[in-house]
């Protein structure tokens, strides 16, 4: 029963049959030439460009021409800002060796020695200020700011002379407790002095 119903239905045309009919066409006409690759690319380019956008671009073209002189002004402003900022960057860049120097390593070695000498001078300056601050604090704690001691290397005195003056002051003070305190306070100051000389100094960049 089912086979009888399917028989009177006409078969659908396949792709091969339709392509043959289109290619042959009428019996007296020649088959049309197949499009080349260039034609195919041109068609795609034309389809990719919508006409509405092109019409809007052509309509807005006159005002764009009037706005074109603004570009050179912006470029001039940018060049002036770059020229103003160039001295700041040039000061940060390291100095290059002179063209007359034969070996650049000698120049680099000389620069490193100069930096080392500058770093050695800085600890001495900071160390002297640190000694003064320590002696002032010790004098304030003991209640006798007049007895604050000066570092040895600043006045060029010998350590023995300093101990003699401290001993004389202790004998004239009429108080053995104060004499012992002055002798004990002289020892930490000398220890702190040696520590400040050997401590490394950290330079902020």
Curated annotation (Swiss-Prot):
Transmembrane segments: none annotated. Keywords: Cytoplasm. One of its GO terms (biological process) is regulation of autophagy. This is Protein DEPP. Its main location: cytoplasm. It comes from Rattus norvegicus (Rat). Residues 56-173 are annotated as: Disordered. PANTHER family: PROTEIN DEPP1 (PTHR15426:SF6). GO terms for cellular component: cytoplasm; mitochondrion; peroxisome. It comes from the Eukaryota. InterPro entries: DEPP (IPR020133). It is found in: Cytoplasm. Residues 71-80, 138-150 have a biased composition (Basic and acidic residues). May play a role in autophagy.
